[in-house]
Amino acid sequence: MGSEMCIRDSFYGGLAQIIAGLLEAKNRNTFGTVAFTSYGLFWLSFVAMKVLPALGLAPEPSTAAVGAYLIAWGVFTALLTAGTFKSPRTLQLVFITLTILFFLLSIGDLTGSTKIRVIGGLEGILCGSLAIYLAAADILNEVYEKKTLPV
């Protein structure tokens, strides 16, 4: 993991999502609070798993440990996915694809399969694209006070 990825993942993936989660708490949105703060902390912990060993402050985690960690996040995400079933279809798809992504990445780590890792990466692009579309739709629909992009 390069330094640019560590910076991006720590601040945009981690800190920004934690702040978003805290703002969702202010809005009394339990789902948004749990999802954003949890995934923000995921990114900070994932970066720490890569950075701390590089600094000599912790041992390098085994691929089995990383795989198990990703399985735990897959299970957590599957549980959150159940909370999206009364939400817009696009949000459901983001969480379904995120669940699949965590499991594919964990299988890739546990088996060492490059093919599964590549499939996981492609699936991650799909998940990220859906999330970007959802964010754009939320912003445009609010700004124009009408459904400009369906969700």
Predicted regions and their residues:
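Short, small-residue-biased leader/transition segments that mark boundaries at the very start
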Residues: M1-C6
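Hydrophobic alpha-helical transmembrane segments
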Residues: D9-Q17, F42, A65-F76, I119
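Membrane-helix exit/interface motif
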Residues: I19-K26, S45-P59, F76-G83
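A structural feature that tracks compact, well-ordered secondary-structure segments
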Residues: A20-K26, G32-A35, L105-G108, L134-D138, ...
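Membrane-helix interface "capping/anchor" motifs
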Residues: L23-F31, A82-L93
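Helix-adjacent hinge/juxtasegments
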Residues: T33, T37, L41-A68
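Alpha-helical membrane segments in multi-pass integral membrane proteins
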Residues: A68-L79, R89-L110, I116-A137
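Extramembrane terminal tails and long inter-domain/linker segments of multi-pass membrane proteins
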Residues: N141-V151
